[in-house]
Structure formats: C-alpha cells, structure tokens
Amino acid sequence: THINLDELTHLQAINKKLGAGYHICEQDNVMWQELDQHIESYSALFSALGHDLKHDSRGFYYFASDESTPNMGKISRAIALTIYILIEHFANTGKDPMRALFDEVNDLELMQTLVQINKHLFDQLEIFSGSDLRKDVYLRMVRLGLAREVEGGFMLQAPIHRYIDALMEVNEETYITEDEQ
C-alpha cells in the first residue's frame, strides 16, 4: 500500500487519540471522515507502527489491545458493570434497554440511583456515590470516546457496543456452562 502522508492531514490528532485508548466515532466528525476516506493508508501505517486499527461497522474506530495493564482492567470492569447495571435498570423501569442506553441522558440523579440500588457491587470498585460514578466512570468514558458530556449529564456513544458484546459473551458462556452440568 502506497501511503501519501500529505493526504493524512489529521494523522497526529488521530494517532494521539487512538494511542490513548480513545474510540473515534461519527460524532468526532473530522477525524472520523478522514479515517473513513483513507482507511487503507491508516491501517497500513498503524500496522507498520505495531498497532491494530479496528473499524466496527456500528460506527467507530479503535486500536485493538490486550488490556493487560492492571489499571485498564479495573477501568474496564467499572465501565462494564455500569453498562450492565444501566441495561438492567432500564429493563426494570419498562424501557427498551438498548434504545434507552443511547437515547437517555445519564444525569447525576440516575447515577445516584444506580449506586444506591447496587451498593454491594459498586462498593467493590470503591464507588460510593453518584458523584464517584460520574468522576471515576463517566468522565473516563468521555476520555475513551465511549460517552460525551451533554447539558445535564452524559450520552453514551456507539463504542459502548464493545462492552455490550463482552457482556453478551460472558452471558452466553454462563449459559453454556450451566447446560453442560
């Protein structure tokens, strides 16, 4: 693949974001369009640099990683738990959980409710209030491109599907294991 660096006008910004674990999605207009238009060049360049650029058909790009650092594992667990609890909460309140995940603003009141109802789970992650959840999980999700801050709270973005996929895999493995017993 011939790579014309002059065409990759946002290479530095894209590399910095992806290298920090950020997921570039359609809301990241300029970077998203450039990746979309020059995907072959970016894939070849990042591959030569030792990165595995992934494009998810649900609308986002990211570097595949093994998430081997202990700290990233803790962050991922906190995000996964929050997503799982949100899905459960929306289902319990009679909403379509998948629609609500992406359509509802996650405000401080909701965060406080989630922490109170699931205190035993959040305590293990040292999250004791809605403010802790906001600071330790939601602001981290913004830094990773999984959510964006809006007036009154946060909106989840398409890259959250990576966590939903992982939760579904765990769920399927649990059922398979139970069936085999």
Regions found by a protein language model. Give the residues of each.
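Eukaryotic partner-binding/assembly regions in large regulatory complexes
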Residues: 1-73
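Leucine-rich, amphipathic alpha-helical/linker segments
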Residues: 11-25, 91, 97, 101, ...
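Minor-groove-contacting beta-hairpin "wing" of winged helix-turn-helix DNA-binding domains
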Residues: 60-64, 153-158
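Short, amphipathic alpha-helical interaction segments positioned at domain boundaries
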Residues: 74-78, 159-181
